Amino acid sequence: MLRQLIVSTVGRRMPLQMISQSRLASNLDKTEYTTPGEIVDYDDPPHLPVPEYPVRPDEPLQTRKQRLLYQSRKRGMLENDLLLSTFVAKHLKDFNAEQTAEYDQLINGVSNDWDIFYWATDTKPTPPQFDTEIMRLLKEHVKNHEKVQRIRQPDL
């Protein structure tokens, strides 16, 4: 009986077949297009210009660190917000000028934040130009050997 009828929130009864047909407008199952665990990664179309990130050689180290702290917390993608903000809270204060420049290039030189996430989690191989000391440090941070909960960004 339960499988045949579903009581809607307004108290109206609707046959299960009607619900399953109206569930998707096209009546196609989404599994026809992707498989579980598949990475959907398309190349950027050639007509989409990605602006070059401006190099800031005269920026003071303290100003650069403050900017990177902000940019690490505000990626627009929760996964990277959590990974990068906790990474920066732990390591940025100890970075020298060269390491800070490497980190700047890593988070701002890549046009797609998903690339950073996939590289850091070893889902995709890291390209040689981004396989630096900082990326290796980030990969170790992502492994979370200390089993620290990272469900929110650290306080400022």
UniProtKB/Swiss-Prot annotation:
- In its keyword annotation, does this UniProt entry include Acyltransferase? no
Keywords attached to this Swiss-Prot or TrEMBL record, sorted alphabetically, are:
Chaperone, Mitochondrion, Transit peptide
Q: Which domain of life is it from?
A: Eukaryota
- GO cellular component term of the entry, any: mitochondrial matrix
One Pfam family name from the record? Sdh5
Quaternary structure, per UniProt, is: Interacts with the flavoprotein subunit within the SDH catalytic dimer.
Q: Which Gene3D superfamilies match?
A: Flavinator of succinate dehydrogenase
**Keyword Transit peptide, does the record have it?**
yes
Q: What is this protein called?
A: Succinate dehydrogenase assembly factor 2-B, mitochondrial
Query: Which terms does the UniProt entry file under GO BP?
Result: mitochondrial electron transport, succinate to ubiquinone; mitochondrial respiratory chain complex II assembly; protein-FAD linkage; tricarboxylic acid cycle
Q: Where in the cell is it found?
A: Mitochondrion matrix
Q: Which family does it belong to?
A: Belongs to the SDHAF2 family.
Primary role: Plays an essential role in the assembly of succinate dehydrogenase (SDH), an enzyme complex (also referred to as respiratory complex II) that is a component of both the tricarboxylic acid (TCA) cycle and the mitochondrial electron transport chain, and which couples the oxidation of succinate to fumarate with the reduction of ubiquinone (coenzyme Q) to ubiquinol. Required for flavinylation (covalent attachment of FAD) of the flavoprotein subunit of the SDH catalytic dimer.
